[in-house]
Amino acid sequence: MSSAPLVGYSSSGSEDEAEAVAAGRSKPGTGFHRCGQNPVPSEKLPVPDSVLSMFPSTEEGPEDDSAKHGGRIRTFPHERGNWATHIYIPYEAKEDFRDLLDALLPRAQMFVPRLVLMEEFHVSLSQSVVLRHHWILPFVQVLKDRMASFQRFFFTANRVKIYTNQEKTRTFIGLEVSSGHAQFLDLVSEVDRAMKEFDLTTFYQDPSFHISLAWCVGDASLQLEGQCLQELQEIVDEFEDSEMLLRVLANQVRCKSGNKFFSMPLK
């Protein structure tokens, strides 16, 4: 039996976005002074606490409390000014899609009871990377420029597949994209170019584009492959109007950095 495909999902945030496999690195040419030049320290008067409390730092990322997100543990430590950043195509779940999930989850829980639904749904175009706060807006502008020429398109995600993250600490049930793969590759190519400009980790060489539906802590791929996977696929295939339900319009690319969202409409 082949192992479950790897998928990068981060351990923080409500949507379990792509996992950062490399910590944020300094942008080339920044953060250093020339040899022979000694930086001259400047003295600053201390700011009263009463004033500081009025202006909370805008560089501070979201609070890192694993108890608030299912006990998941960050793969990379939270540091002041570092923001987990993820690029994806959002999918807005309608009532019919929720009905499909209501049929799939109980069946999957017969094999792995600890499975829970994702809080939101998307197709990832990047891994999760660590971006410095002052790079967010320049990075988003580069992304917008690269996305400007892309047309909106339809894709179909109807193949049930089991995924794990690289550390095998979490398992996901997803619907793999069966049509529209070429358009996703084109988008990833441009996202990767933006990543390289900021010395960030690019996406996987042979990505399996998908919408994650449910997840659990730990490696449950052995329990979910085989009989469970077959039964889940039968539910999808036999679900009323599943062909139309799982044909999705990709009309925007979204970037989430910390608790900030940036949307880039496709033409």
Curated annotation (Swiss-Prot):
Q: Which domain of life is it from?
A: Eukaryota
Task: Kindly list the GO CC terms recorded for this protein.
Answer: nucleus
Q: Name one GO biological process term.
A: U6 snRNA 3'-end processing
Q: Per the UniProt record, which EC number(s) apply here?
A: 4.6.1.-
Keyword Nuclease attached: yes
Asked if the Swiss-Prot or TrEMBL record annotates the protein with the keyword Lyase, the reply is yes
Q: What residues bind UMP, as annotated?
A: Q166, Y204, S208, F209, H210, I211, S212
Where do Polar residues bias regions lie? 1-13
Q: Which reaction does it catalyse?
A: a 3'-end uridylyl-uridine-RNA = a 3'-end 2',3'-cyclophospho-uridine-RNA + uridine; a 3'-end uridylyl-adenosine-RNA = a 3'-end 2',3'-cyclophospho-uridine-RNA + adenosine
The record's annotation in InterPro entries points to: Cyclic_Pdiesterase (IPR009097), Usb1 (IPR027521)
What SUPFAM superfamilies does the record tag this protein with? LigT-like (SSF55144)
Location within or outside the cell: Nucleus
Q: Name one GO molecular function term.
A: poly(U)-specific exoribonuclease activity, producing 3' uridine cyclic phosphate ends
Active-site positions on this chain: H122 (proton acceptor), H210 (proton donor)
Q: Where does AMP bind?
A: H122, V123, S124, Y204, D206, P207, S208, F209, H210, I211, S212
What's this chain's function? Answer: 3'-5' RNA exonuclease that trims the 3' end of oligo(U) and oligo(A) tracts of the pre-U6 small nuclear RNA (snRNA) molecule, leading to the formation of a mature U6 snRNA 3' end-terminated with a 2',3'-cyclic phosphate. Participates in the U6 snRNA 3' end processing that prevents U6 snRNA degradation. In addition also removes uridines from the 3' end of U6atac snRNA and possibly the vault RNA VTRNA1-1.
Family, similarity comment? Belongs to the 2H phosphoesterase superfamily. USB1 family.
Protein name (database record)? U6 snRNA phosphodiesterase 1
The organism named in the record is Mus musculus
